[in-house]
Amino acid sequence: MAIKRGVRLQCNESKSINYITTKNAKNNPDRLSLNKFCPKCRKVTTHVEIKKK
């Protein structure tokens, strides 16, 4: 069975956490990086996976 875990995506510019998604940790061990819309910046920016506190 695939190991799926929840990850949080943080905007690189405003540092706000805007999205929560899941990823397969076995197939994608690297950090997730996606271009998404940031409501605080009001534009499309790069969002990266952050560690849980």
UniProtKB/Swiss-Prot annotation:
Question: Which Pfam families does the record match to this protein?
Answer: Ribosomal_L33
Q: Which GO terms describe its biological process?
A: translation
Q: Name one GO molecular function term.
A: structural constituent of ribosome
S-S bonds: none
What does the UniProt keyword field contain?
Answer: Ribonucleoprotein, Ribosomal protein
Please provide, in alphabetical order, the Gene Ontology terms of the cellular component aspect for this entry.
cytoplasm; ribonucleoprotein complex; ribosome
The protein's matches in SUPFAM superfamilies, at most eight in alphabetical order, are given as:
Zn-binding ribosomal proteins (SSF57829)
Which superkingdom heads the taxonomic lineage of this protein's source? Bacteria
Q: Which HAMAP family match?
A: Ribosomal_bL33
The Swiss-Prot or TrEMBL record describes its family as follows: Belongs to the bacterial ribosomal protein bL33 family.
Q: What is this protein called?
A: Large ribosomal subunit protein bL33
